[in-house]
From Swiss-Prot:
PANTHER family: DIHYDROOROTATE DEHYDROGENASE (QUINONE), MITOCHONDRIAL, DIHYDROOROTATE DEHYDROGENASE (QUINONE), MITOCHONDRIAL-RELATED. This is Dihydroorotate dehydrogenase (quinone). It is a peripheral membrane protein. GO terms for molecular function: dihydroorotate dehydrogenase (quinone) activity. Binds 1 FMN per subunit. It comes from Rhizobium meliloti (strain 1021) (Ensifer meliloti). It comes from the Bacteria. Pathway: Pyrimidine metabolism; UMP biosynthesis via de novo pathway; orotate from (S)-dihydroorotate (quinone route): step 1/1. Its main location: membrane.
Length: 362
C-alpha cells in the first residue's frame, strides 16, 4: 500500500517543475502527510563515529532541507541523521531559474542552485526549537559576493555551535564561482586552520567539542586528493564527506538536459564518487571517519559505499525517484545483509572492497 502511495505521489510531483515539487515535498513533511516507513531499530547498524552515536548509518545529505525546515520530520521517516544547509551568513537568492533539472532516464538531477537559502538567522531560529538529541548536522558555506569567504565559514561555526551536532564545511559546490578553489592546498590549509581554531574556541567556552567534516568534489586529480588528505591529517580534522556533485556528463542517456550547467547527482554519480571515496580512504588511513554520498539508491549501493571505506552514508537525489520510503527500505536491507552474512555489526564489511574501488578507472 505504501509503495502504491509513493508511486502516485511521485507521478503527481513530476507534473510540477522540479523546484516547485521540492517545495511541495517540504510542505508535506511539515504537515505530517508523509507516512513513517522507518525500520525497526537494529543494534548491528548502530555505531559511534566522531564521538556521535548513530542509530543507523543512513543520513539525508545537505541540499534537501536547506533552511532547517524539516530535520526532525526526516529523522522520523527513517534517517539515522540529517544535514541541513548549505547555509550562508546572509540570505541569498541563488542563481537564476530554471536551475534544477530531472534526468528521468538516468534517475539523476542537475542543479545550479547556487546556495539559495534564507541565511543563518532563519535556520538558527528553527534549529533552536529542535530536540538536542536529534542528530542534525549543519552544512556551512560562503556568500557568493563575500569579500572574505573563510570568515563566512568561521561565522557559521560560531553561529550554530550551540545547536549543531556536527559541521560540514562545503567547499565543493560547482555552482558558486571560485568556491572549489578552496580545495587547493594553500587555501585549504588557511580554511581548516581558521575553522578549527573557531571550533576549539567555542569548545573551550561551552565544554562540548563539535566535530567538523569537509565535503569534497569527485572531480579531483590524484594530486588534488593527495593535497586534501595531507591537510586534513595535518590539521586533525574530524572527517570527510565524499562527494559532492560532479561536472562530468559521461554515460548519460538523457541527452536533452545533459548540457545544462551545474552539478550532476543521482545514480550516474555512484561509481565515480565511490572510487574517489576509496582513494581517499587509502590516503587518510583506517581511522578518519568518512561519510560516503553519491548515487545511493538501495541497500546494496549503501553497503557498497561501506565496503569502499565509508563509515556512514548519505543520500538525496535518489529519494526523488524512489520516494520517502527509501531510507527505511535501505535500513531494512542492511539488517537483512547482517542477518544473511551473520555480521555482528555493519562495520564488519567496511573496506572489504577497498582495493577494488580504489583501482577503478572512472
Amino acid at each position: 500500500m505504501i509503495g502504491q502511495l509513493e508511486h502516485l505521489a511521485r507521478r503527481g510531483l513530476f507534473l510540477f517543475d522540479p523546484e516547485a515539487a521540492h517545495g511541495l515535498s517540504i510542505k508535506a513533511l511539515k504537515s505530517g502527510l508523509v507516512p513513517s516507513c522507518a525500520a525497526p531499530a537494529d543494534p548491528r547498524l548502530g555505531q559511534t563515529v566522531a564521538g556521535l552515536v548513530f542509530s543507523n548509518p543512513i543520513g539525508m545529505a545537505a541540499g534537501y532541507d536547506k533552511n532547517a525546515e524539516v530535520p526532525e520530520a526526516l529523522l522520523k521517516i527513517g534517517f539515522g541523521f540529517t544535514e541541513i544547509g548549505t547555509v550562508t551568513p546572509r540570505p541569498q537568492a541563488g542563481n537564476d531559474k530554471p536551475r534544477l533539472f530531472r534526468l528521468v532516464e538516468d534517475e539523476a538531477v542537475i542543479n545550479r542552485l547556487g546556495f539559495n537559502n534564507e541565511g543563518h538567522g532563519a535556520a538558527l531560529a528553527r534549529l533552536k526549537a529542535c530536540s538536542r538529541e536529534a542528530l542534525i548536522g549543519v552544512n556551512i558555506g560562503a556568500n557568493k559576493d563575500s569579500a572574505d569567504r573563510i570568515a563566512d565559514y568561521v561565522t557559521g561555526i560560531r553561529t550554530f555551535y550551540a545547536v549543531a551536532r556536527y559541521f560540514t564545511a562545503n567547499i565543493s559546490s560547482p555552482n558558486t564561482p571560485g568556491l572549489r578553489d578552496l580545495q587547493a592546498r594553500e587555501s585549504l590549509s588557511a580554511l581548516l586552520s581558521a575553522v578549527l581554531a573557531a571550533r576549539d574556541d567555542e569548545a573551550r567556552k561551552g565544554g562540548r567539542q563539535v566535530p567538523v567534516f569537509l565535503k569534497i568534489a569527485p572531480d579531483l586529480t590524484e594530486e588534488g586528493m593527495d593535497d586534501i588528505a595531507a591537510e586534513v591529517l595535518a590539521h586533525g580534522l574530524d572527517g570527510l564527506i565524499v562527494s559532492n556533485t560532479t561536472l562530468s556528463r559521461e554515460g548519460l542517456k538523457d541527452r536533452r538536459q545533459a548540457n545544462e550547467a551545474g552539478g550532476l547527482s543521482g545514480k550516474p554519480l555512484f561509481e565515480k564518487s565511490t572510487a574517489v571515496l576509496a582513494r581517499m580512504r587509502k590516503r587518510v588511513g583506517p581511522h578518519l571517519p568518512i561519510i560516503g554520498v553519491g548515487g545511493v539508491c538501495s541497500a546494496e549501493t549503501a553497503a557498497e559505499k561501506i565496503r569502499a571505506g565509508a563509515d556512514l552514508v548519505q543520500l538525496y537525489s535518489c529519494m526523488i525517484y524512489e520516494g520517502p520510503g527509501l531510507p527505511g527500505r535501505i535500513v531494512r536491507g542492511l539488517s537483512a545483509l547482517c542477518e544473511r552474512e551473520k555480521l555482528a555489526s555493519i562495520r564488519d564489511i567496511r573496506d572489504s572492497r577497498l582495493d577494488y574501488w580504489s583501482g577503478r578507472n572512472v
